């Protein structure tokens, strides 16, 4: 045994799986052998593995036998498949070798037989014959049927010559073994150099032609029907096999019997009279006819044979002219289809190996996703040392481990992705040009809303508190040329980062507004990063160029440093100088926006039957109307009465309003609309999807709520447990508890993000509760119980809540500008900070003489070198530069009088509290401690 084998280790569970025995049995045996193992996941060395295999040799032998049987079955199936494939290839070769017959001659009637029919003789010509255009019409019926049944190459019939002799028929080719012997044309085909000639000797009995059947007309009638034609093609192979078997049976039955038709006797004559003359062959034929006249005909259904012949000829006529190339094309198509199916199967197999699951899924849910039973999940968890039940929720690590055990890869998704409604695939013919969605971004007070005011010919700024945009405004504007543009006006304050990110996700084009009298600010850089991350084109608008201090070139230079090189400087970003107040350059800016939209070819499905989809831009709670959300429609038409699901909530559209509050009946793609009818407040950025029924919408919303609730519960529990040690360690961490109530969901998110950034190692903001709507009694009671302050952003308390807050003496603050909220919370947190202590030097003294005073101790006679010393000052005694005392004065005197202070240049006497070892030459420094307010 090599060193590598000795070092190899094996997992007990893998060995048990190989032997197909219980892992617990293997673990029990290993422990009996004295090995120290903890569980079935423990590793053992190769020598222990050999002991296990030897102990469970019977089980291993049974497993080996089972595998051997499976292998034999697999090989047998492989051989059968190979034989089937070879048989199919031979049949295809046989079909390819079949050629098309010339137009068949008239078929003879067999009802009325003349006593002395004319019998054509078969002779072989050695000289080159002249080719006649047609075969003799008096060809016997039996030979005609045989020729139709077995199509071969067309045979030319030459004129008879003087010297003729009969030769024996050559051996048939191997590929034509199933063809009946009575076909004279097949014998002629076996030797290409020989040509068959039919003679009509006089005074020879045979059949008399009394009529004919028009086979071509019957075939034409059959080919006129497309349905029958397709059915014949499908049955082509089956009919050929059936026809071949019937003729073989007929040939065997006629071997010992007299031929029923004179044509059959003529085909047998050359074989039996080999080397004789034609007359001898004729005598033999006539004698056979006399002997076998009373025998019965072979049991062959002539009607079935005739129908099969016609069907076969019809199928060959349809595929005539390039049948070989058509067969090759079919084979190529079949191979291509097989390759496509294999590729699709490989993709499906790869997709099947990935399990998209939410965190904290139950064992039953995980089993359904992997296509196994929950019992198997529980058993595998048991072998891994985890005890779970069917409805127990598994953590992330357990889900990954169990998925790997069953050959799957776990991919964790959110509750919205896990309950994805349906994927939308619109056909290109259903898509139409839609208006572009343009988001206006930039720094605070750079003129974003003023730009939109000029476009809308309205005054949005007047409606915003402090002239600062604090909501995402969605507006639809129709230009002078009839084109429509949807504008999203985002806040520029740093607290609204999430709002700007949402605006970049749903937009098509970004107008980046930069003030020409200012510079590129941090929020400008942030807007550029949001746009680039969302892969959205940027059109730069340099505003306020009408001001005398405007410097557009400086703005272009700063933008190039930020990665936005405008077209004027050879870049790819369009740029326009404007004045939102005066309207300068506005027309050119709109043209550039429309040109950018045409380049991107923005399209959407305008079908009224398509399920509508959109994005929640903003949400708010109205006292009289309830939850109102601004939805940007992206697909289809949103109509009143449509059931929908949005995030974790659902509802039915009760009313639709435009941005000016006017009621509308429907809203199409790229149109912003205010929707009434939500059960709960959705979050900004949630997807809005119209569902077929209320029941389906409610089921999806409930599933998402359950998953979200479980996530929050598990996460909060884990945070609390993890934070116990941290809280014990920190001990003196101070928190400012707040309750936030605002008018919209976006404002709440902005406030929460801004407040959570205000913290340090000593103080922080703890948001206990946040919600949309007015301040209620519940909020006041919660604030009283948790000793929190209430922040109302653009909302007020109701009468009962106001009375209760006064009774509880709670601090309730109201704001309408986000700046003021953040500033005051910062001040409150700074007041909670411990002040910083600074030392301020007051002066220094030199001890020039030491006096001994009874009951007091040593008193130093000092001279004030600089500064000033006070009675309550702290002092520090230095001897040769080394501090030997730090304390306070016990007394300060000038002559015999106590004084409060002594200035520089004066003498004084002092003694130190609790210290008397003073010497001449020591220096006394006077100082005091000053408290300084700390800043965050």
UniProtKB/Swiss-Prot annotation:
Region Disordered, residue ranges: 102-332
Ranges where the record places region G2: 467-471
Listed Low complexity bias regions: 151-160, 272-281
SUPFAM superfamilies: Initiation factor IF2/eIF5b, domain 3, P-loop containing nucleoside triphosphate hydrolases, Translation proteins
GO cellular-component term (any): cytoplasm
Region (G3): 489-492
Compartments reported by the entry: Cytoplasm
Disulphide connectivity of cysteines: none
Biased composition (Polar residues): 182-194
Function statement: One of the essential components for the initiation of protein synthesis. Protects formylmethionyl-tRNA from spontaneous hydrolysis and promotes its binding to the 30S ribosomal subunits. Also involved in the hydrolysis of GTP during the formation of the 70S ribosomal complex.
Xref: NCBIfam families: IF-2, small_GTP
Name of the protein in question: Translation initiation factor IF-2
Organism field: Prosthecochloris aestuarii (strain DSM 271 / SK 413)
The gene coding this protein: infB
């Amino acid at each position: 045994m090599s060193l590598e084998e000795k070092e190899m280790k094996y997992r007990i569970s893998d060995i048990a799986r190989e032997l197909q025995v219980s892992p617990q049995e293997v673990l029990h045996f290993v422990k009996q052998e004295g090995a120290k193992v903890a569980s079935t996941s423990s590793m053992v060395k190769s020598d222990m593995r050999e002991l296990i295999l030897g102990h469970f040799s019977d089980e291993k032998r049974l497993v080996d036998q089972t595998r051997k049987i499976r292998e034999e079955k697999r090989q047998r199936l492989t051989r059968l498949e190979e034989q089937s494939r070879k048989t199919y290839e031979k049949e295809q070769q046989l079909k390819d070798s079949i050629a098309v017959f010339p137009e068949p001659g008239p078929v003879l009637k067999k009802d009325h037989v003349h006593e002395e029919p004319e019998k054509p003789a078969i002779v072989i010509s050695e000289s080159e014959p002249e080719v006649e255009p047609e075969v003799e019409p008096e060809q016997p019926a039996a030979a005609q049927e045989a020729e139709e049944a077995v199509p071969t190459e067309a045979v030319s019939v030459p004129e008879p010559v003087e010297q003729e002799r009969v030769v024996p028929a050559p051996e048939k080719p191997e590929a034509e073994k199933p063809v009946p012997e009575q076909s004279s044309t097949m014998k002629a085909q076996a030797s290409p150099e020989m040509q068959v000639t039919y003679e009509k000797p006089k005074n020879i009995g045979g059949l008399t032609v009394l009529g004919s059947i028009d086979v071509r007309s019957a075939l034409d009638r059959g080919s006129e029907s497309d349905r029958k034609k397709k059915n014949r093609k499908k049955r082509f192979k089956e009919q050929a096999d059936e026809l071949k078997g019937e003729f073989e049976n007929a040939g065997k039955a006629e071997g010992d019997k007299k031929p029923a038709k004179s044509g059959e006797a003529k085909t047998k004559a050359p074989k039996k009279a080999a080397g004789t003359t034609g007359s001898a062959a004729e005598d033999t034929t006539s004698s056979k006819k006399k002997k076998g006249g009373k025998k019965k005909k072979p049991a062959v259904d002539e009607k079935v044979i005739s129908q099969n012949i016609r069907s076969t000829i019809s199928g060959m006529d349809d595929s005539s002219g390039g049948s070989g190339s058509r067969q090759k094309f079919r084979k190529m198509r079949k191979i291509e289809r097989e390759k496509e199916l294999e590729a699709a199967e490989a993709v499906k197999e790869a997709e099947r190996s990935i399990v998209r699951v939410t965190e904290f899924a139950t064992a039953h849910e995980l089993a359904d996703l992997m296509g196994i039973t929950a019992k198997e999940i529980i058993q595998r968890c048991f072998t891994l040392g985890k005890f779970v039940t069917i409805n127990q929720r598994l953590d992330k690590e357990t889900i990954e481990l169990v998925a790997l055990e069953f050959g799957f890869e776990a991919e964790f998704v959110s509750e919205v992705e896990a309950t994805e409604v349906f994927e939308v695939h619109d056909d290109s013919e259903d898509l139409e040009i839609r208006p572009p969605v343009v988001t206006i971004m930039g720094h605070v007070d750079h003129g974003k809303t003023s730009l939109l005011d000029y476009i809308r010919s309205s005054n949005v700024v007047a409606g915003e508190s402090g002239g600062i945009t604090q909501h995402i405004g969605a507006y639809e504007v129709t230009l002078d040329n009839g084109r429509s543009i949807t504008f999203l006006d985002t806040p520029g304050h740093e607290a609204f980062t999430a709002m700007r990110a949402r605006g970049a996700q749903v937009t098509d084009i970004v107008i980046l507004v930069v003030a020409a009298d200012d510079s590129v600010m941090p929020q400008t850089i942030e807007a550029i990063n949001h746009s680039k991350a969302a892969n959205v084109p940027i059109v730069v608008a340099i505003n306020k160029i009408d001001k005398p201090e405007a410097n557009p070139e400086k703005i272009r230079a700063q933008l190039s440093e930020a990665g936005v090189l405008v077209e004027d400087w050879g870049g790819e970003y369009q740029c326009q100088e404007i004045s939102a107040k005066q309207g300068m350059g506005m027309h050119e800016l709109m043209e550039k926006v429309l040109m950018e939209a045409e380049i991107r070819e923005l399209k959407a499905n305008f079908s009224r039957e398509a399920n509508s989809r959109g994005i929640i831009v903003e949400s708010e709670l109205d006292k009289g109307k309830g939850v109102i959300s601004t939805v940007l429609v992206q697909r289809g038409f949103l109509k009143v009465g449509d059931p929908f699901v949005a995030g974790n909530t659902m509802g039915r559209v009760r009313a639709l309003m435009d941005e000016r509050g006017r009621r509308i009946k429907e809203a199409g793609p790229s149109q912003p609309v205010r929707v009434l009818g939500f059960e709960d407040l959705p979050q900004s950025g949630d997807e809005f999807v119209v569902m077929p029924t209320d029941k389906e919408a409610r089921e999806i919303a409930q599933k998402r709520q359950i998953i979200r609730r479980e996530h929050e519960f598990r996460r909060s529990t884990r945070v609390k447990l993890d934070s116990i040690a941290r809280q014990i360690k920190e001990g003196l961490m101070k928190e400012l508890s707040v309750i936030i109530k605002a008018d919209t969901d976006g404002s709440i998110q902005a406030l929460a993000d801004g407040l959570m950034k205000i913290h340090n190692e000593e103080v922080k903001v703890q948001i206990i509760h946040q919600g949309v709507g007015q301040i209620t009694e519940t909020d006041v009671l919660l604030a009283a119980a948790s000793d929190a302050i209430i922040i109302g952003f653009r909302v007020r308390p109701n009468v009962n809540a106001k009375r209760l807050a006064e009774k509880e003496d709670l601090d309730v603050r109201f704001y309408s500008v986000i700046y003021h909220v953040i500033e005051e919370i910062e001040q409150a947190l700074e007041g909670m900070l411990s002040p910083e202590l600074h030392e301020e030097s007051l002066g220094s003294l030199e001890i020039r003489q030491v006096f001994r005073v009874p009951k007091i101790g040593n008193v130093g006679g000092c001279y004030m070198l600089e500064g000033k010393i006070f009675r309550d000052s702290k002092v520090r005694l230095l001897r040769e530069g080394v501090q030997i005392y730090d304390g306070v004065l016990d007394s300060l005197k000038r002559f015999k009088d106590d004084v409060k202070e002594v200035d520089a240049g004066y003498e004084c006497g002092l003694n130190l509290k609790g210290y008397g070892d003073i010497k001449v030459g020591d220096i006394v420094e006077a100082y005091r401690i000053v408290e300084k307010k700390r800043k965050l």
